[in-house]
Amino acid sequence: LDKSAFDFDFIDIASIEVLKGPQGTLYGRNTMAGLVNIKTLSPLEKQGSKIKLSFGNYNLWGVAATTSQKLTDDFAFSINARYRQDDGYFKNEYTRQNSGSTRSGGGRVQLDWRVNRHWKLSFSGDYEGSDQQGYPYAGYDKTLKKTGSISYNDEASYRRDIFTSGLSAQYLHDRFIFTSTTGYQFLDDDMHLDQDFTPRAIFTLQQKQKMHAVSQEFAVKSHKGKRWEWVGGLFGFYQQTHTDGPVDFRQDGIDLLITKQTNDQLAALKQNPALAGMPDITIDIDNRNLYIDGIYKTPAYGAAAFGQATLNRIFIDGLSATIGLRIDYEHTRIYHHTHATEDLTGHANVTINMGNRPPMSIQQPFILPLGIDGKESMNTIELSPKFEVKYAIGNKSFVYALATRGYRSGGYNFQMFSNLIQSQIRSSMMSELMKNMGGGGNGGRPAPSRSAVGMPAFENTTDVNQAISYKPEHSWNYEIGGRSQLIDHRLFADLSLFYIDCHDQQIAAVSGYGRVTKNSGRTASYGLEASLRATPTNRLLLSATYGYTHATFQEYNDGKNDYKNNFVPFAPAHTLALSGAYTLPLDKETDLTFDLQYLGRGKIYWTEANDAAQNFYGLVNASIILSGKYADLKLWGKNLLNQHYQAFYFETMNAENLSMPNSFVQCGRPITFGADITIKF
């Protein structure tokens, strides 16, 4: 349920199914871009044991062991354990230590029980712990298009423990199939960031969270091959997340982000002709650091009902129509407590022009307690319909047209609370200064009123819920396409054309002290996907896949810039995958396979302004596999031409020049190579 839990290792994969486009009708929330359905091998279907050893450059090594055994004809289990590490591919020039090294390990158990000819039960539990030393973000000059070095001084790391379990029950009736799926997930992670990614001591961020999530689905579906095929069910979930997200402003951060920024704003105010009588004011801060602690509890729960029906053989054989609908209700709440562990203290240096009299100089101390407490909530009801018409031409080809609606849940940006504290500092400081100036503290002389010295009033009227929240994203997807077997069992072709109309698309953006998710108005995307798979001989497999996407903003103005007709960030215009595999039998039990792959993608724009981008690039991968009855040997290499490219780009606040954000990139992995040895018994 949580995106921090998406990245983990699998062993004993039986199949991987990629479902494109919104899958919300059957699968619900956050599947508007598609779904990857991964199935693992059942110990009832395959038994045996194996040990896999892996070695590679950059000190890569790993070990994995698995065993699947039957205790009876109807009850079986599988157990596996794994460990993997590498030293990362880059170096932090400031610390002279590797950046991006990873250590991960875990285990999985699966129990499958065929109770009788009707009932089947399956339980799985998976644990994984990982420790990463990050992050390999290097400075980047957008003007010169030049990548600098990785150089920052504070800790950057990510540690995660995750446990996922599931219990499924299936009842096979003569007329229908009933399934019950129960899931539980526990996540405990801890992220540290040098948020400025520079050698200066500006500010750091920690985000530590614990999450418990449970889900339940009941579904009933018909058997395949009937004229009416249908599925319906109920779904519910509950998720409780506790997040600690402190931000620590170091000495440079206080000097640049509080003292200098406040003094610059005061100087700018004085230049306003309407405030010609405003006194000269500067401030000094006593704190050596300012620790802003943030504690956030975010419970969420939801329920859904869904159904889908397909009518086959409409008027003629091969013609079918599908209609589906899902209704989701979701409630999300946040209890937030953000506060400075110590008051912000300092003094203001005020010089008031008294006309014909000597200027009045005041050194006014201030003590500012900082904190924001409260609770916010959002409720959403979503409808996800699906309409599809399909025509099958025999058993070899079909064409289709469909329209589906998808959505992605809204949420809250924890990092926005640091921005709100900054606003509170400005408003509280000015209010405190004006209160004290109006009440004494000036050597016994009567203090002039605020209006007499031309001071403006400062009030903090920020709507917290509006500042920290982002809305759900919605889209309508339209697609036409087809699949054909052009030559019997030798050549397969797929082609699809799509158009996506998206509203309130969620994008990552720079906002004050970090990156946040925000809504971007309306976007439109259109394109195509085409693939060919050929087996000219039983030993040779060739495949080619190409995708084109044209995704642009139709309506998006962030209050400063209008991005209409700009390309949507992080959406590659072209994707290309070419692969070939040739298998040479050496004897009855031994094969030698040569595999070659080319993967290309780009152009990718990184920002809404389209002022930073990665051009099209391609990676060459290859492997040689010697496979036998008792052992396998695989020699592999990735990015064999050592292509240099940007895997990720982002911008963050430049503390030294607030008008010009800092840019950073994560470079792609260089050439890597290694060997896997698998022993089977």
Residue ranges and their predicted role:
Residues 168-193, 400, 426-519, 524-526, ...:
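Membrane-embedded beta-barrel scaffold of Gram-negative outer-membrane proteins
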Residues 1-20:
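Short acidic/polar hinge/loop motifs at secondary-structure boundaries
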Residues 45-46, 54, 66, 70-154, ...:
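Periplasmic-side early beta-strands and strand-to-turn transitions of outer-membrane beta-barrels
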Residues 91-98, 135-151, 196-204, 248-293, ...:
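Solvent-exposed loop segments that connect transmembrane elements
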Residues 11-14, 25-92, 97-107, 118, ...:
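Outer-membrane beta-barrel translocator/receptor signature
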Residues 221, 225-227, 231-235, 315, ...:
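Gram-negative outer-membrane beta-barrel transporters
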Residues 241, 407, 537-542, 599-607, ...:
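C-terminal beta-signal and adjacent terminal beta-strands/loops
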Residues 40, 53-57, 83-87, 127-131, ...:
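Transmembrane beta-strands of outer-membrane beta-barrel pores
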